[in-house]
Amino acid sequence: MLDIKLVKDKELDELWHIHADTQEDVENARPFGANLELWENSTMRFRKNDNSWWGIPGGSDAVAQVVKEGWAEGARKVEKVLGQIEPPRVLSSRRKKSRGPTGDEIDMQRVYAGSLDSAWSCMKREDGGKLRSPMSVTIVAHVGGNCHRDAEELFWSGACAVALARALRNSGRSCEIVGMFYTSHTTDEGKGICVEIPLQRMGAQTDLETLAGVLCLGGWFRNHGFKLMSMAPERVRSSYGRVVDRIPQCVKDKYTGAVIQITGVYDQESAKRFVQEETSKWR
């Protein structure tokens, strides 16, 4: 499902916040009528075998295949550069059965007895009084870029998210990952656009190749990101606006607790520094 709202941001008067629940929602949707030609031209114009735009040979068709099957080469690159950086493992947590109105298993005896508020059960982690860092983390990564950014530059923000997801998984924590992109002066009316899509739900199994195929591959954003922006119900400028390297308030407000925000990372050294600084906070 797509959710399109006009919201206010503290630095921009108004912007269109476009949220997609899944990648399939983006694939099945059509851009706003006034933006259809712009989106078709932007994808067709670069459909040639241009690695600097798509990130891999074969154009948008190859990108679609990688998004579906995962990107082993991208995952290996992340592992080689950022894979040695780890937060400490969680050793003091334990799991305890918890009952409530939702969960993983249902007790039919409680259902028949009318105790619906405690009929479901699931196993939850307990701190035990020794943990210094949260067990669940949200990673919000600014993963896009306009035409002046090549695929190698777009790789590194996503690489930070993949490396942190791997490190959090290996240390016994769970995370959700959200990809977003934010521009100002994007429509003819002068409004900005922020697009947002969840790429890994909290508690889901972390598949590094699948994550690399969307977060690190410039072509994923060229296909999905630009298409999402074209769904704004106003005419979008051909430049797709000016990139704003921060997370807007409308996205920040949706995620509470431990949140890692990734913005302005466009090269290998910046990615190393960012991941090292973030993992050092978990000690």
Show which residues each predicted segment covers:
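Residues that scaffold, gate, or flank divalent-cation-dependent active/transport sites
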Residues: H142
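Acidic, glycine-rich A-domain
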Residues: M1-E69, P134, G145-A151, F155-A159, ...
